[in-house]
Curated annotation (Swiss-Prot):
Residues 9-110 form the CUB domain. GO terms for cellular component: extracellular region. The keyword DNA damage does not apply. InterPro entries: CUB_dom (IPR000859), Sperma_CUB_dom_sf (IPR035914), Spermadhesin (IPR000124). GO terms for biological process: single fertilization. This is Carbohydrate-binding protein AQN-1. Keywords: Acetylation, Disulfide bond, Fertilization, Heparin-binding, Secreted. It comes from Sus scrofa. Pfam families: CUB. Belongs to the spermadhesin family.
Amino acid sequence: AQNKGPHKCGGVLRNYSGRISTYEGPKTDCIWTILAKPGSRVFVAIPYLNLACGKEYVEVQDGLPGAGNYGKLCSGIGLTYQSSSNALSIKYSRTAGHSASSFDIYYYGDS
């Protein structure tokens, strides 16, 4: 079940809205790319983030993977981001041997 639904490690998400959740498998880096319709923007909300700082982080990238980002996040409440185009990427990274902390990231595109 680790490669299905919101618990998958990375991939391209084309749904209008959805959720990215904790990945607990063996990979240490996961990148999700959210693609909205051309001309639309992507909105991301992280209601609560409490990762083990120094051992794991989430990075919100404004565009395709490798685009400019808003920094490495390991904690926060009520975090929101908006893309400048129809693409936004989320990277999750953790140190090998460190078990993943739980998180939920919600996204949606404007129509």
